[in-house]
Amino acid sequence: MKVKEIMSTNVISIAPYAKIIDAIGVMLSNNIRRLLVEGGMIVTIRDLVYAWDKLNNSVSTVATRNLLFIDPEADVIESAKVMTSKGVGSLLVGDGIKVLGIVTERDVIKALRVGKDIMAKDIMNADPLTCVKDESLSEVVELMKERWTRHAIVVEDGSVIGIISVRDIARALAAKRDLRKTKVDEFMSVKVIYARPDDTLEKVREMMATNNIGVVPIVDPAKGLVGSIGERDMLAAIVVNSF
């Protein structure tokens, strides 16, 4: 399978002097997580949310100048290898000058299966970021920044009751909410798709692909939350075990 078969051609650009809050609005209205920034830069929704207390600053202050390209004729597995080795979640598709599209880790996860002899417990993050429902969103964002993650699992009395993502927090910012006065349960997702430690990794991949989600909590019936598998974890496993 070639990159051109799974890439998105919905690549939107924004001026470098646009405000961070305006870039958040563009992402949410177009249901995307990345924007090209004129002048050879790219910015992600994580970059924008991490700057929650600087919303009137220009996008260029948080954008990345390191644009990574892949040829549209390259195999999809090659794009996964590049993303994993470079620690990025997307690649521009093109010749290094002209942008034809973008391919993301989520596109790859939807396209490539992983060996069924691998269990969720084999690759899960055994120390996922957690929070409680009455924490402020500002507190959660700062924890996310410390752990360089896009999600926090919301727990109560040992049970998983929700997930809060940078996209959820972006919605709060777009609604002009003060994150210091806004609680997690006002914007968290309560529809939680979770897996068991002994579920196959392929089953978890299918959960991600089917439900278009970026993280799956791993829940043991006796112990409760024991880990999580995010897109970056899954991508690394695909690189080694795809078929």
Which role fits each region the language model picked out?
Residues 1-243:
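Tandem CBS (Cystathionine beta-synthase) repeat/Bateman regulatory domains
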